[in-house]
Regions:
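Short amphipathic alpha-helical segments
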Residues: 44-46, 97-101, 121-123, 234-235
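ATP/nucleoside-binding phosphotransfer catalytic cores, i.e., glycine-rich phosphate-binding loops
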Residues: 43, 208, 215, 240-241, ...
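ATP/NTP phosphate-donor binding region
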Residues: 2, 16-88, 95, 103, ...
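Gly/Ser/Thr-rich active-site loops/lids in small-molecule metabolic enzymes
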Residues: 179-187, 229, 237-258
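Glycine-rich phosphate/pyrophosphate-binding beta-alpha loops
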Residues: 164, 168, 222-236, 301
Length: 330
């Protein structure tokens, strides 16, 4: 059983009473929950438009803007068992709601208005106008999706897109604290360039399902469920969110010049032929690090640890996806 994250934090504002719907939870067929801080405040600018649209075009749905993560979890848990949860935000929004979604087994739809949106990319809904994404999230069928969980210290944190260790996590922290006027890939690339100035390495020992996988100087070791991370970077293009496996991408020692040469290859998904990179599918891995390695999940920085476990949670969540044969929304 997943434990509730100890650091549940505020969305940074109190609940807006005017955003609360007329419908009671018992009458709700879906809960549309908006994170006003997603996408650097982009979601907040659409709050009134989305609320009005939900009330006029989707009267069975309930629209809310939660003041805190705890409030949002409580709203999810108060919805009827067959109600769908539609999150308006990005990967961070989805990650913070994931414990409640897994615990209640509610179906998940996404309206991607965040900075990262790698989960939305994997589900095929990234790039849709929010009106179309909302209609799809409320009406299309759901399918099973894998998740992952990282355990370190006393914490057990689930994720849908990725768990990064090392350089990638340091970049995630810089991206979270980056300029507000940048979103998505440009923000991530700026954070990457800034972290290259430091270019730290760690001594990592990685075991995959009990067998040695790698030991030595390592730039990063990141586990992916989705093909992309960092706002669309195709780190493991062959990753599959429904295969019951995660994929680890491990980078050995890189100089600054070598990392700069590798970056455009990574952006194009042409990096896996490099002998300093190793990719391996797994159900569970164990990592020992010296010194403590920074950890992030779905772009959310968690802290540092000398020891962590990463495991797949097969078919743990039902999500609304869109494939090439999904009928167009009209």
């Amino acid at each position: 059983m997943l434990r509730k994250r100890a650091h549940s934090s505020e969305w940074s504002r109190q609940s807006d009473v005017t955003a609360l719907p007329i419908l009671s939870p018992a009458m709700t067929s879906a809960l549309v929950l908006l994170n006003p801080f997603a996408g650097g405040g982009r979601a907040a600018k659409l709050e009134d438009a989305i609320r009005t649209h939900v009330r006029s075009d989707h009267p069975g749905a309930r629209f809310v803007v939660a003041g805190t993560v705890a409030d949002a979890h409580a709203m999810i848990e108060d919805t009827p068992p067959d109600a769908r949860i539609v999150l308006v935000g990005g990967d961070g929004t989805v990650n913070r709601m994931l414990p409640a979604l897994v615990r209640t087994q509610r179906e998940l739809g996404i309206v991607p208005l965040g900075s990262g949106n790698d989960v939305a990319r994997a589900l095929g809904v990234y790039g849709l106008a929010w009106v179309d994404a909302l209609a799809h999230a409320l009406s299309a069928p759901a399918t099973a999706m894998d998740a992952g969980v990282v355990t370190f210290g006393e914490r057990e944190v689930p994720f849908l897109a990725c768990c990064t260790c090392g350089f990638d996590s340091a970049v995630a922290l810089r991206a979270l604290n980056g300029p507000k006027f940048l979103r998505g890939l440009p923000r991530y690339l700026l954070a990457t360039l800034r972290e290259l100035v430091a270019l730290r390495h760690w001594q990592l020992t990685v075991h995959c399902e009990g067998k040695p996988l790698r030991a030595g100087t390592t730039l990063f070791a990141s586990a992916l469920n989705t093909p992309t991370f960092g706002s669309g970077i195709p780190a493991v293009p062959h990753a599959n969110i429904r295969d019951g496996l995660l994929d680890v991408l491990i980078a050995g020692r890189f100089s600054r010049a070598g990392a700069m040469v590798m970056l455009p290859r990574l952006l194009l998904g042409k990096h896996l032929a490099d002998p300093r990179l190793h990719s391996n599918a797994f159900r569970g891995i164990e990592i020992h690090a010296t010194p403590n390695v920074p950890i992030a999940v779905d772009g959310e920085y968690l802290g540092e640890s000398a020891h962590l476990l990463i495991d797949v949670l097969p078919a743990t969540l039902r999500v609304v996806a869109r494939t090439n044969d999904t009928p167009a929304i009209t």
